[in-house]
Amino acid sequence: MAEKGLSKKTYWIYGIGVSYFILDQIYNQWLSYYYLPPANEQTLKPLLTPTLLILAFIFGRIIDAVTDPLVGYLSDNSKSKYGRRSFFMLLGGLPLALTMILFFFPLRSSIMATFLWVALINGLFFTAYTLVGGPYNALIPDLAKTKEDRLNLSTVQSVFRLIFTAVAMILPGYFIARIGNGNTEKGIRATVVIFTILGVLGVYLCAFMLNEKELTKNREEHKHIKFKDSVKHIFEKEIVIYFIAFFLFFSGFNILRGIVNYYVVSIMELSVKSNTTISALLFGAAALAFPFTNKLAKKYTYKKVLIGDIILLIIGTVGLLFVTKENRILAYPLFILCGLGLSGSAFIFPLTIISDLAVSLGERKNISVEGIMFGIQGMFLKLAFLTQQIVQTTLLVRGSKTLGNGFKQATKMGVYSTLIAAIVLFSLSLVFYSMKKEEK
């Protein structure tokens, strides 16, 4: 897929850098499960009430709120000898790994101690996540000079991102069962350590081996502007519409992938390790659709293909509402359908659209805003995480009996309710994506 100007080696090294998405998936899939397990999980007990868990997530986001655009702005103006993006990846990798592991070793001296632990670690985790993810994604418009190049590099990143996400969705269930040997907490802790090391290793390989400084030496120099002036440029109509659509979509997507464990255990009534099969179908279908999505985007437009993807995703998610233990075989083709819809909507197009917007704005204003654009997108992605956590934590316990100390557990009614919320968010994102004009 490499085009003139970028070698195959560069594509490979850049793709490896998205390994931090292993941690993203662990966070999304296992954190709520660890602190708020389903009723039929025998070896895990709730560590926080739903309300306290939500407050911990919100508190962490407040700490993190300013870092996304700030890191983006700093990387746009960095003069580091390691490259203006790679420097921040090197800076954030180790803190990202450490905070991920600490999530699963909370203080338990009291409920308040656990709450403060989760809130603090959450803020530190996403600050480190910003240092890695924002500058990494901003490399796309730095390295790729044309719209087609950006589509290709985004597709390569999406392939690797899907591989790493799938690894983190498919394998942990097996590792947890095998290592834990009946003790889910032991299995989760060991599995998190293993996969966290793998995820951060790719970040450092990319930062050290990409040779960003050499690859971007001919990049056009733009005038330096103040942080507040950079932010002002982001409020163009088309950019605002895109960010709203992006936020709504990823709120729904995070909910969908975040309840896979609950769906498998509570609705399909299978063991937690069975999420391996479901996850493989979901992300395998997306992977198979990548080359077709790339070709369709070149033949038609990003917008048309993206809208088609979201419609497929809505149909598949609606179908999941009608699955029960008795007809659970229907869940398999429905997750495949969802996976086909995720190919462009969750993986390829968010990267290409924001890259094109950043390049277009930069050329019109003679400014460098790639980093801050991806930083603000990262901020909306984290707001989507927060929305997912609030919606999921609130709805999953619908119909649950209150246990001691106000604890509740996830229920079937809660899983179905959470899916409905995802469908609503997907539908709203479809409306806003339909409003956005196509970049030339």
Q: Which role does the model predict for each range below?
A:
Residues A2-K440:
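Membrane-embedded alpha-helical bundles of multi-pass transporters/translocases
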